């Protein structure tokens, strides 16, 4: 068995195992990723993120869910990648460009005490609303905003958004009382979502103040989802429920999401290193 060095980090409770692959090209099988992510027999995480060198950006974020499947992007994950590369001396830039499966994203690091990163703002790019590009199998290419979705005995309405990965946003009266763990997996694997989908269940808490629970594709319910929060703000604005500068509370913490005049979405939130170690794989 080989020994693998890792760092565990979290962004408002969305926790991943980070592996620095800038010096050695480390690759793991889906089974190894499942083992590492297991909260009883492994380190325990929502997945594994490799930090790699990039020919297109300054660094590359290579992300995998806890079930071993690959994913294009994670908003909380990219903030942790940005913190790692700065705090561990891999870059001195406060605006590094990070390559992801959703494209190259630029981050803005807010430095706190001890010359460590406290907050990270990420330009998440423009939301995608064209059904075939999300993707959603739909009757036409018009945007899907508050459209009916029947799941079991629930008659829901959903808005479909891609932030580099697919999201289905559903507004409900009380997210905490809603059966997320029962309904979430049914929507995730619904036939209209050919690549499966992340599902957000959202409650309005006040003007430009929303509360979100997330069922993540390949990971189940998580404490937070950054790309999901971006999709929630977009859906809230498009349905007239919120403005373009919104506080979104998640079970793990709070994010600020802004829809800028350029059309791009800006996400700002914390990132924290929990511990480092080695594991036999």
Curated annotation (Swiss-Prot):
GO biological process: lysine biosynthetic process via diaminopimelate
GO molecular function: diaminopimelate epimerase activity
A GO term from the CC aspect: cytosol
Pathway field: Amino-acid biosynthesis; L-lysine biosynthesis via DAP pathway; DL-2,6-diaminopimelate from LL-2,6-diaminopimelate: step 1/1
Record-linked Gene3D superfamilies: Diaminopimelate Epimerase, Chain A, domain 1 (3.10.310.10)
Reactions catalysed: (2S,6S)-2,6-diaminopimelate = meso-2,6-diaminopimelate
InterPro entries assigned to the protein according to its UniProt record, in alphabetical order: DAP_epimerase_AS, DAP_epimerase_DapF
Binding site for substrate: 14, 65, 75-76, 165, 198, 216-217, 226-227
Keyword Amino-acid biosynthesis applies: yes
Pfam families for the chain: DAP_epimerase
Active site feature: 74 (proton donor), 225 (proton acceptor)
Enzyme class, broadest EC rank: isomerase
Site, Could be important to modulate the pK values of the two catalytic cysteine residues: residue positions: 167, 216
Top-rank taxon, per record: Bacteria
Alphabetized UniProt keyword annotations: Amino-acid biosynthesis, Cytoplasm, Isomerase, Lysine biosynthesis
Entry's localization field: Cytoplasm
Keyword Isomerase applies: yes
PANTHER family, per database record: DIAMINOPIMELATE EPIMERASE (PTHR31689:SF0), DIAMINOPIMELATE EPIMERASE, CHLOROPLASTIC (PTHR31689)
Role noted for this protein: Catalyzes the stereoinversion of LL-2,6-diaminopimelate (L,L-DAP) to meso-diaminopimelate (meso-DAP), a precursor of L-lysine and an essential component of the bacterial peptidoglycan.
Subunit architecture: Homodimer.
Protein name (Swiss-Prot/TrEMBL): Diaminopimelate epimerase
Organism: Leptospira interrogans serogroup Icterohaemorrhagiae serovar copenhageni (strain Fiocruz L1-130)
Lineage summary: Bacteria, Pseudomonadati, Spirochaetota, Spirochaetia, Leptospirales
């Amino acid at each position: 068995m080989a020994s693998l060095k890792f760092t565990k980090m979290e962004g408002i409770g969305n926790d991943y195992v980070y592996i620095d692959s800038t010096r050695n090209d480390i690759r793991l099988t889906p089974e190894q990723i499942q083992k590492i992510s297991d909260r009883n027999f492994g380190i325990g995480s929502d997945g594994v993120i490799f930090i790699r060198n990039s020919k297109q950006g300054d660094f590359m974020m290579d992300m995998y869910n806890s079930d071993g499947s690959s994913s294009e992007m994670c908003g909380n994950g990219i903030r942790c990648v940005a913190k790692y590369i700065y705090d561990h001396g891999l870059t001195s830039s406060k605006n590094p460009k990070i390559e992801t499966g959703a494209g190259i994203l630029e981050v803005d690091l807010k430095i706190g005490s001890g010359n460590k990163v406290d907050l990270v703002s990420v330009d998440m790019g423009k939301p995608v609303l064209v059904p075939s590009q999300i993707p959603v199998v739909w009757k036409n290419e018009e945007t899907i905003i508050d459209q009916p979705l029947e799941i079991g005995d629930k008659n829901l309405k959903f808005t479909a958004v891609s932030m580099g990965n697919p999201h289905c946003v559903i507004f409900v009266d009380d997210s905490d009382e809603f059966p997320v763990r029962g309904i979430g997996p049914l929507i995730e694997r619904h036939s209209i979502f050919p690549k499966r989908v992340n599902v957000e269940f959202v409650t309005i808490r006040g003007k430009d103040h929303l509360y979100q629970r997330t069922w993540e594709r390949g990971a189940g319910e998580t404490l937070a989802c950054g790309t999901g929060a971006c999709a929630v703000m977009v859906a809230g604005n498009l349905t007239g429920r919120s403005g373009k500068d919104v506080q979104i509370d998640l079970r793990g913490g709070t994010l600020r999401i802004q829809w800028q005049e350029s059309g791009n979405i800006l996400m700002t939130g914390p990132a924290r290193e929990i511990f480092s170690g080695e594991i036999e794989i």
